[in-house]
From Swiss-Prot:
The protein's name: Trigger factor
The species this protein was found in: Brucella melitensis biotype 1 (strain ATCC 23456 / CCUG 17765 / NCTC 10094 / 16M)
Example GO biological process: 'de novo' cotranslational protein folding
Reaction equations catalysed: [protein]-peptidylproline (omega=180) = [protein]-peptidylproline (omega=0)
Family: Belongs to the FKBP-type PPIase family. Tig subfamily.
Annotated function: Involved in protein export. Acts as a chaperone by maintaining the newly synthesized protein in an open conformation. Functions as a peptidyl-prolyl cis-trans isomerase.
Domain PPIase FKBP-type stretches: 169-254
Length: 477
């Protein structure tokens, strides 16, 4: 096999490979001889089938197998010999001339093909011990825990039918029918809907107009759907709702004790408080980690500038762009609504894709040099978590992952990345800073800009006045 480099520009490589017809013939002769000893053909004794007869019957199919084996093995062997790592699977380019292909299969012509690929750039890991980040820390007060406990426990609160007008925190049972320009709209009606006034369960302006109504009252209310509403056909529109109040119920006193905790599946009130505190700590911890991780990535972004494989960037950009357009479509928005143009958005997200690829390569190199590995247990846990996300389809998802190496690699990658971040955190300068929960949860402008408009679209409310109905309508948008 003759290997010749025909292109070496930046990360791009093109390798011409020539497998002489004589080499192909030698491989075919070896395969025919092996088959001769095993072949069972009518009219011939076992092991006595003439090679010429086997060649006539199986020569082309055997040669096709040989060619495929060469193609499958050549990429790996050539890259290994050249001490190169391909960013993606090398592209194989062969002659499309059918006559030429027939000559190769007949053993009368050399097999010639080319491998096109981009190599992974050589990255020299720099000293990262001088990277300094600030880790924001929030002290969780007992008052915050108690407030959250009350919010959770409110689901166990009972209500008692009352006479008189509905007040804030009362529960009303209503029938409603929504109309646009006097015509009912899909998803805008329900019977025996229960709503706790002041809960924010319905769209803004809806609940307030029910205060003061009594059982048996009927009223037509007018609301305006938010301009950034999830359903485009309702966004910014004025609608009316025919309301019939069927019951008004006042809340009984909310008692926080062990019995209330048990109704929530927790053995005691003290354990409930502990669980809630752990949940709050976890939520704040995730936000803190994301902010610290961004600081690390920004520092690495400044330290490492190199050419990135364009096919990797293309793939990353396509993933981002697909999600952006999906989110915009779901929200009924356009690039103009987001105060940009498609061209400008493409340029912005192309830069983001390049940054992600470059930082991914840097983290990969740092992790490899540090000996970071994803254990089988960690990978199995990720597989289990992924399967669990699809109730009723567990077997299908598991089988898909088992037979799709790329899907498993996609599960491995984020685990590896987080372990590399852990390695960096253990070796850089980290300064803790006490902040309020408002400061911690304040949206970072740079992070938000990366998500725009996907982040904005995802934050929109769905269609219909009730959250349950909103979820159903979101699938149509």
């Amino acid at each position: 096999m003759q290997v010749t480099e025909t292109l070496n520009e930046g990360l791009k490589r093109e390798i011409k490979v020539v497998v002489p017809a004589g080499d192909l013939e030698a491989k075919l002769a070896e395969r025919l001889e092996t088959a001769r000893g095993r072949a069972r053909i009518n009219g011939f004794r076992p092991g006595k089938v003439p090679t010429a007869h086997l060649r006539k019957m199986y020569g082309k199919s055997f040669m096709a197998e040989i060619v495929n084996e060469i193609l499958n093995d050549s990429s790996r062997s050539i890259l290994a010999e050249r001490n190169e790592k391909s960013a993606t699977q090398p592209e194989v380019i062969m002659s499309e001339d059918e006559k030429e292909a027939e000559k190769v299969l007949d053993g009368k012509a050399d097999f010639v093909f080319s491998l096109n690929y981009e190599v992974l750039p050589a990255i020299e890991v720099k000293d990262f011990s001088k990277i300094a980040v600030t880790r924001e820390v929030v002290d969780i007060s007992d008052e915050e825990v108690d407030e959250q406990v009350k919010r959770i426990a409110s689901s166990t609160r009972t209500f008692e039918t009352k006479k008189g007008k509905a007040e804030n925190e009362d529960r009303v049972t209503i029938d409603y029918l929504g109309k646009l320009d006097g015509e009912p709209f899909e998803g805008g009606a329900d019977n025996d809907a229960q709503l706790v006034l002041g809960s924010g369960q319905f769209i803004p302006g809806f609940e307030e107009q029910l205060i003061g109504l009594k059982a048996g009252d009927e009223k037509v209310i007018t609301v305006t759907f938010p301009a950034e509403y999830g359903a485009a056909h309702l966004a910014g529109k004025e609608a009316t709702f025919d309301i019939k109040v069927k019951e008004v119920a006042k809340p009984n006193e909310l008692v926080l004790d062990d019995e209330t905790a048990k109704k929530l599946g927790i053995e005691s009130l003290e354990r409930l408080r502990q669980v809630v505190r752990e949940q709050i700590e976890s939520q704040y911890g995730q936000i803190t980690r994301q902010k610290v991780k961004r600081q690390i990535l920004d520092a690495l972004d400044g330290d490492y500038q190199f050419e990135t494989p364009q096919k990797l960037v293309d793939a990353e950009f396509n993933n981002i762009w697909q999600q952006i357009n999906f989110d915009l479509q779901q929200a009924g928005r356009t690039f103009e609504d987001e105060e940009t143009t498609e061209e400008a958005a493409r340029e912005e997200y192309r830069k983001l894709a390049e940054r992600r690829v470059r930082l991914g390569l840097v983290l990969s190199e740092i992790g490899e040099k540090a000996g970071v590995e994803v254990t089988e247990e960690e990978l199995q846990r990720a597989v289990y978590d992924q399967v669990r996300r699809y109730p009723g389809q567990e077997k299908e998802i598991y089988d898909f992952l088992r037979r799709t190496p790329d899907a498993v690699a996609n599960l491995r990658a984020p685990i590896f990345e987080e372990k590399v971040v852990d390695h960096l955190l253990a070796n850089i300068n980290v300064t803790d800073k006490k902040v309020s929960k408002e400061e911690l949860t304040a949206e970072d402008e740079d992070a938000a800009s990366e998500a725009k408009p996907a982040k904005k679209a995802a934050a929109k409310k769905k269609a219909a006045p009730k959250k349950k109905a909103e979820e159903g309508k979101s699938e149509e948008a």
